[in-house]
UniProtKB/Swiss-Prot annotation:
<protein>
    <recommendedName>
        <fullName>Chitin-binding protein 3</fullName>
    </recommendedName>
</protein>
<dbReference type="GO" id="GO:0050832">
    <property type="term" value="P:defense response to fungus"/>
</dbReference>
<dbReference type="GO" id="GO:0008061">
    <property type="term" value="F:chitin binding"/>
</dbReference>
<dbReference type="GO" id="GO:0031640">
    <property type="term" value="P:killing of cells of another organism"/>
</dbReference>
<keyword id="KW-0929">Antimicrobial</keyword>
<comment type="function">
    <text>Chitin-binding protein. Has antifungal activity against F.solani, F.oxysporum, C.musae and C.gloesporoides but not against P.oligandrum. Depending on concentration the antifungal activity can be fungistatic or fungicidal. Inhibits both spore germination and mycelial growth in F.solani at a concentration of 0.1 mg/ml. Has antifungal activity against C.krusei, C.albicans, C.tropicalis and C.parapsilosis. Has no chitinase, beta-glucanase or hemagglutinating activity. Acts as a flocculent.</text>
</comment>
<keyword id="KW-0295">Fungicide</keyword>
<keyword id="KW-0147">Chitin-binding</keyword>
Length: 22
């Protein structure tokens, strides 16, 4: 997902790796 940062911000996932968009 190219918009991983936005996805993480919405889900508030600060800890990498962030797999919010999978």
């Amino acid at each position: 997902c190219p918009a991983i940062q936005r996805c993480c911000q919405q889900l508030r996932n600060i800890q990498p790796p962030c797999r919010c968009c999978q």
